[in-house]
Amino acid sequence: RTLKAKIMAEKNYAFYPGCSSQKGASAANYLTSVNAVCNKLALRLTAIPDWNCCGASISYAGGSELSRQVLNARNLALAEKHLPGQDVVATCAACWLAARETREQLVASEPLRADANEALEVAGLEYQGKAKVRHMVEVLIEDLGLEALSKPVVKALDGLKIAGYVG
């Protein structure tokens, strides 16, 4: 491995597993795959303690935009509190998008962040906007690189038809 890949591979990440990755859920196999890949590449994912649903589908249930933002802000605040300095990594595209959009909106708007923090205060939390939100694919490509990813391959999957998981 290159020095950059070695250094980045030893980095820890605050992991947001998401509801669909839980046992018996639609993407439980996805979590199994992510864990196997991270173990092989020596990436350390630490689940955000007491994480909650990202609220990606809350609008369908009549929830407000602020409710969805507070759900994500809570996860990000928990990551900042318990896993400081670590990027938040999600594997589900819907979870990643919900968390990333919330971060962007709360960082850009002090009044919106104040509203979210007022709700979080009940749980003794405050969102500060420090944690960066990233997708697992981003981490693999940007932090490790394609060359480092190809080295541990035992059997190439050339010609295999695959489908992405969209959340």
Regions found by a protein language model. Give the residues of each.
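Iron-sulfur cluster-binding electron-transfer modules in prokaryotic oxidoreductases
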Residues: 3-167
